[in-house]
Amino acid sequence: MGHKHERPVEPFSDLHVEHGHVRATLLHDPTVEGLDMAIYMDGSASMSGDYAYKKKYNNLIDWFFGRNEVNLPNNVEPQVQWILEYLATKDRNGLLRVAYWACGASGKDIELVGELKGTDVQSYKFPGPNFQGKSTNLAPALKDYVNYLRKQMHLGARRGCAVFVTDGEIHDEDDVKRYCNEIAKEMQKGSLPKINFILVGVGEGVNEEQMEEICHEEYPGIGHLWCHRIAEEINEVAELVAVLVDESMTVAGGGRIVDDKGKVLKLYESRLPAVLEFQIPEGA
């Protein structure tokens, strides 16, 4: 049995199976002290249709004369609005850095929207960047966030997490992995706090396979830095931040894990941690 990322169902928010070893994260709404969060929206040309506002008319006559039109939200806006509203409750000061990435002719530019609150999110509009990128480069966005986090560390940030909204078409996967190796080394040295990244797929035709390639990478001494979600498939908001949940968090006083034949695979007597790790026998 190789590495497999299963579709989690309640009560799980994340599930990994590799050679019979299961790592399951229970659905848990974590509180992380000193957490500084950000949202980056894909600004590349492949996302142009997802930023387009569609018009709605009451009838054919209104459509013909172009009157009484109603602008509907684009594919990105409602997703970013609820993500922002939720993540602001996790952020240390309730302000999130929001920006477009993969902008400009090189696909490496960042267009900063600003630091936004999680209140009145329906008033925020996200029509896309001023200059769409001709390629989709994620590494510059990671560097932008890390540089931002370094400054926030002097103001009280003790942990970082950035969400990258995308259609999954990423052109610099090798650069992303190389830079993540640098981040992992700095985390081990203590020059950077613990950081996690979340890819959120939006729109039609999300390239989930490439998102999985990035998220399955493990870094020495750190493990996984990434997780990914498909926005339309998120049923519980806490699923979004499963990557922030760790073994130190407790969800119950105890419990046990049994297979389909009733055999006890693992027993937790004093506390049930939010992250469960156990072996599952072949055929179970």
Where are these regions (language model features)?
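N-terminal accessory interaction module
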Residues: L26, A252-A284
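Surface-exposed acidic, glycine-flexible loop patches that form ligand/cofactor-binding
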Residues: L27-T31, Y86-K90, N147-R158, K185-S191
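Phosphate/oxyanion-binding active-site loops and adjacent basic polyanion-contact surfaces
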Residues: N68-V80, N130-K143, D172-V176
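Short beta-strand-loop
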Residues: R92-P127, E209-I214
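Von Willebrand factor
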Residues: T119-R159, I170, G203-Q210
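C-terminal helix of von Willebrand factor
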Residues: E208-Q210, H216-V264
